[in-house]
């Protein structure tokens, strides 16, 4: 499937009880506007959901704290930038897992690492900034 257009970048600041849901809806809408195939659209939504959920579950983000989500795309990849307050978290470092049978014990971050490439990580003034690239799948389901 050849994508005909590249949508304008999307930048959102999200907070409150619907923030994770709103982030997933925004990612899905962005994927649709970008003309992403099913696999790429699904992966983008899952990566956004996992990262946003981890902010609340493990990153100390409170209900009133806001995080920023930026999405942009090229012909070959979608770039995702997530900026959030909290303790420093460098996704390049190995994570000690406390496995939980009910939650999957780190499976979400494993998906994020499998489906994306870390472009950069910064920690400045109490805020993490993580930039990832997700390759866009072709019609056959493989990344370009």
Language-model segments: which ranges?
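Conserved beta-strand-loop-beta-strand hairpin that lines the nucleotide-binding pocket
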Residues: 1-11, 56-144
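Heptad-repeat coiled-coil signal-transmission/dimerization helices
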Residues: 20, 24-27, 112
